[in-house]
């Protein structure tokens, strides 16, 4: 204990360790997230149906979101470097299972197990690596480290659709996951020699089994309701039963966490308004990831574009978020977190509005989409570092892992439920033959008239995302203080 503590006190974070951490982050946000774009190719090659592939896509974010706080708290006690390494090992095994998934009856077992392990990998790497950034970097160096860490997460997510499509077309989708193994091994090598870091208060650790189980059941039930409600029927017995399960177990979860001293979600962290605002707005800004699935489905189903052509529209998003994420850091240093977070949300909202006019001709819409996706990346870049720094800098030292775990849980669950809800709205409206009639005389639709249901569905689903941006702005203005934090 003493040797570990003295080594950690003397150690200063360097670029070798930081690059190793970033490689771990992109194994989840870049490589694992490519399934959002390549799922049809994977399903076709493996002989799996759409429902199985939808589960395979969703299970990674779901497992990450469910376990990220538990593992973040565990990292504070057993060692953050150790948990990051475990995350690398899980990523390697998970990617290997997906990459070698056989055709036939074992395909779904290999695929779903591998995707679940990738989610657990993200749950290990994200909170523990953020806690290491908080521990081994300070001041401006920490803000730079957070910016580069954010490039791995936000930037990796932005590039994933384009990257997945290009690799699948050139080499085949399996090579995405083989490459992920190589990246994970390199990350492990770069982090060799990093001293262990633990919370200073080494109290006896008690696993919050009841809290974890009730939270997991509530989240899984809610996810099934959102994703399958339209197919099963919103008033069907299974959907109503699952809704009841989600409500009951959710209430039990809050009751258990409020009464136990070993709660895996420490609600006392939310007594700090800055941390609360950063986490809530982070959930909402990740939830507008639903914008991408709706707008890309719109141009493919309504405009008959190919997946590759649709993916190329997002190129500006990837370039902007990587190019401007350091700008968010500079804005943070000059103005504090509040202004750049609000500016980022406003730009993101404008981007979604530009993606919304599905009544235009496809040639006109493509121009707006290119501009919109570029602004989308710019807005998220402005927001990312100020929000992450606001959350990290307001965490007590002994709760760095658990607190950063809650913050990143907001990312995973926000994206999971944002995509699910947006897709559910889009699917429900676009599948109805008479769904567009109520807009006749209100909005003029140019060009083809056989796709009005799809175009109407996209406009309504995208307006839902604009609403979430508005709520994010409100939460920031109510919770994040003006100006820079005093040093």
List each model region and its residues.
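Cytosolic juxtamembrane N-terminal segment immediately preceding the first transmembrane helix
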Residues: 1-30, 44
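12-transmembrane solute porter fold
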Residues: 18-28, 35-37, 237-242, 249, ...
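Extracellular/periplasmic helix-loop-helix junction of adjacent transmembrane segments
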Residues: 38-67, 106-112, 308-312
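Small-residue (Gly/Pro/Ala) motifs that create kinks and tight helix-helix packing interfaces
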Residues: 39, 156-168, 222, 226, ...
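Membrane-interface helix termini in secondary transporters
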Residues: 41, 72-73, 77, 166, ...
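Central cavity-lining transmembrane alpha-helices of secondary-active solute carriers
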Residues: 58-73, 126-130, 315-328
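Helix-loop-helix hairpins in multi-pass membrane proteins, especially solute transporters
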Residues: 76-210
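Hydrophobic transmembrane-helix bundles of small-molecule transporters
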Residues: 169-282, 288, 313, 466
